Amino acid sequence: MPSPRHDALTKLFKYRPELAVEILRDLLDVDLPDTSLIRTEDSTFNTRPSDDIEADLVLVLGPPQEPTHAIIVEIQQDKSKAPRQLARYAAALWLLLDCGVTVLVVCPDRAVAAYYAQPIESGLPG
């Protein structure tokens, strides 16, 4: 069950989705589409026959019928979630929306942030 701190951080981005764009674009130099259209999206990804996977928050940039980019906001307070799970989220949403996807991991703890900042080795060529 998510903690009150987890819920508060998730709501911070849910009620002001522009914050995720500002952090990625202005602080982390991520190239994102230039659009003022940002909306929250269902955060459960169904990849049958596997399990449902659910992100904390999904934001979509661009019009509903033609999304230009998606941002998955994940709040991580400990190292309990495998970093590869974040890649699963991104891949599932990329397949679902057919647009670029960025995962923004928000970690109040520096050690946890360092854990999730490591590159994820997929084993895929290229």
Predicted segments — roles?
Residues 1-126:
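Accessory alpha/beta interaction modules
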